[in-house]
């Protein structure tokens, strides 16, 4: 490429945290629809739903990281690592969900579901991946909703009165 030509920005690098979260919700809805459509048709039929669920999880965690001010380049350098403990702790994820995020990364599940045509086992059951996806997207969404933040107290709470008599 000639020196005077500037590379276009990496796709998504200019997206806001809210836009990334909105995209995660699109993938979440699609995953749920595809899981419903694949019921009773075996694991292979659920592969697209599984991939959408993994993408929804990753996007929601990335939205949280963007919301917290993490630079896009740092987020991108993580690849598909969902196991970072900081968002899990900050979001108040359940232990089972946090352990599942670590397992997803350890098994390289995103890459296996996406690229391995022979994959027939060793990936998360649909109820586990759906529970993880729903919890992550839900808890990230709660952190974006300003009505969920408790207002600061400006005065001391009233003291309790003792009953007389």
Predicted stretch roles:
Residues 1-28, 32, 69-165:
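Long, charged low-complexity segments
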Residues 19, 26, 44, 48-51:
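An amphipathic alpha-helix/helix-turn recognition signal
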Residues 32-47:
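Helix-loop segments that flank and shape redox-cofactor active sites
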Residues 46-66:
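Short, hydrophobic, well-ordered secondary-structure elements
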């Amino acid at each position: 490429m000639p020196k005077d030509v500037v590379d276009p920005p990496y796709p998504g690098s200019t997206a806001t945290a809210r836009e990334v979260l909105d995209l995660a919700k699109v993938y979440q809805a699609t995953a749920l629809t595809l899981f419903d459509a694949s019921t009773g048709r075996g694991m292979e039929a659920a592969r697209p739903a599984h991939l959408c669920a993994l993408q929804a999880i990753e996007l929601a965690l990335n939205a949280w990281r963007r919301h917290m001010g993490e630079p896009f380049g740092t987020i991108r350098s993580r690849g598909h690592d969902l196991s970072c403990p900081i968002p899990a702790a900050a979001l108040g994820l359940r232990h089972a969900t946090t352990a599942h995020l670590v397992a997803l990364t350890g098994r390289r599940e995103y890459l296996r579901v996406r690229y391995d045509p022979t994959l027939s086992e060793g990936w998360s059951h649909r109820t586990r991946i759906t529970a993880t996806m729903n919890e992550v997207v839900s808890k990230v969404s709660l952190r974006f909703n300003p009505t969920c933040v408790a207002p600061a107290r400006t005065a001391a709470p009233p003291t309790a009165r003792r009953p007389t008599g």
